[in-house]
Curated annotation (Swiss-Prot):
<dbReference type="GO" id="GO:0006412">
    <property type="term" value="P:translation"/>
</dbReference>
<dbReference type="InterPro" id="IPR036919">
    <property type="entry name" value="Ribo_uL30_ferredoxin-like_sf"/>
</dbReference>
<dbReference type="GO" id="GO:0022625">
    <property type="term" value="C:cytosolic large ribosomal subunit"/>
</dbReference>
<keyword id="KW-0687">Ribonucleoprotein</keyword>
<dbReference type="Pfam" id="PF00327">
    <property type="entry name" value="Ribosomal_L30"/>
</dbReference>
<dbReference type="InterPro" id="IPR005996">
    <property type="entry name" value="Ribosomal_uL30_bac-type"/>
</dbReference>
<keyword id="KW-0689">Ribosomal protein</keyword>
<dbReference type="GO" id="GO:0003735">
    <property type="term" value="F:structural constituent of ribosome"/>
</dbReference>
<protein>
    <recommendedName>
        <fullName>Large ribosomal subunit protein uL30</fullName>
    </recommendedName>
</protein>
<comment type="similarity">
    <text>Belongs to the universal ribosomal protein uL30 family.</text>
</comment>
<comment type="subunit">
    <text>Part of the 50S ribosomal subunit.</text>
</comment>
<dbReference type="InterPro" id="IPR016082">
    <property type="entry name" value="Ribosomal_uL30_ferredoxin-like"/>
</dbReference>
């Protein structure tokens, strides 16, 4: 079974750079406290690492 990440948007996007907004949208997050589960791939990890100050994430088995 492959690993998954649960990613939650914990900060508002007001005043955030447009590139960072696009990264958050690419993860599928729409509003504050919205969570999504994604496969743990290098691409998803890279997106999370671009905006760590906006997100909370945890590994799921």
């Amino acid at each position: 079974m492959s690993k998954h990440l649960r990613i939650t948007l914990v900060k508002s996007l007001i005043g955030v750079a447009e590139k960072h907004r696009r990264v958050v949208a690419g993860l599928g997050l729409r509003h504050t406290h919205h969570s999504v589960e994604r496969l743990d791939t290098p691409e998803i990890r890279g997106m999370v690492n671009k905006v760590p100050y906006l997100l909370r994430w945890e590994e799921l088995s």
